[in-house]
Regions:
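Residues at helix-coil transition
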Residues: 1-2, 33, 63, 114-118
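Alpha-helical substrate-binding/gating segment
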Residues: 1-7, 15-42, 48
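Short linear capping/connector segments at secondary-structure termini
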Residues: 9-14, 73-77
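Structured loop/turn residues at secondary-structure junctions
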Residues: 11-13, 46, 100
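Conserved C-terminal active-site "lid" loop/helix of NAD(P)H-dependent oxidoreductases
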Residues: 21, 75-102, 107-111, 121, ...
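Non-catalytic, hydrophobic alpha-helical segments
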Residues: 24, 28, 43, 54, ...
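Mid/C-terminal beta-alpha module of Rossmann-like enzyme folds, strongest
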Residues: 31-80, 140-141
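Amphipathic terminal alpha-helices
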Residues: 105-141
Length: 141
């Protein structure tokens, strides 16, 4: 794994919320077992992080420390970064009333890294983010 700086949109302040697939499966099982009156739930980990915090956790999962390069708005965020330029934070209190414990983002990222490392043939990069960065915004550190 090469050491690369991370090209951070807008100083990394946008908020993100994730949900591990194992928690989704557990929640579906809870719904089937409990048959709650409510049928609509916002699902997500109650842990809200900024892009910068998320990237730091991703790097930690692989035993690295990130170096950040801020990217200004002259570049469209989706050309070099996987998330759209908007944030959302869901109220997951109703989910939490049925399932109070979820996998931490840090642990989920660690598990996913191990899986991806063991299954490189399953990794498919849909967008050429690195190519865009190298051609249009790369800086020498």
């Amino acid at each position: 794994m090469r050491d690369r700086p991370f090209y951070l949109p807008r100083n990394g302040e946008m908020k993100l919320q994730f949900f591990h697939v194992s928690d989704l499966c557990r929640f579906i099982t809870i719904l089937m077992d409990k048959h709650p009156v409510q049928h609509l739930f916002n699902l997500g980990n109650p842990e809200i992080v900024t892009v910068k915090e998320w990237v730091t956790l991703c790097y930690e999962a692989v035993g690295k420390l990130p170096t950040f390069v801020s990217v200004d708005q002259t570049h469209h965020q989706r050309d070099y970064f996987c998330f759209y330029d908007y944030e959302y934070v869901l109220d997951v209190s109703k989910q939490s009333s049925l399932m109070p414990v979820t996998l931490s983002l840090k642990e989920g990222l660690r598990e996913e890294y191990v899986w991806y490392k063991d299954h490189p043939e399953s990794v498919y990069n849909r967008k050429p983010y690195l190519e865009y960065i190298e051609r249009h915004i790369s800086v020498k550190l």
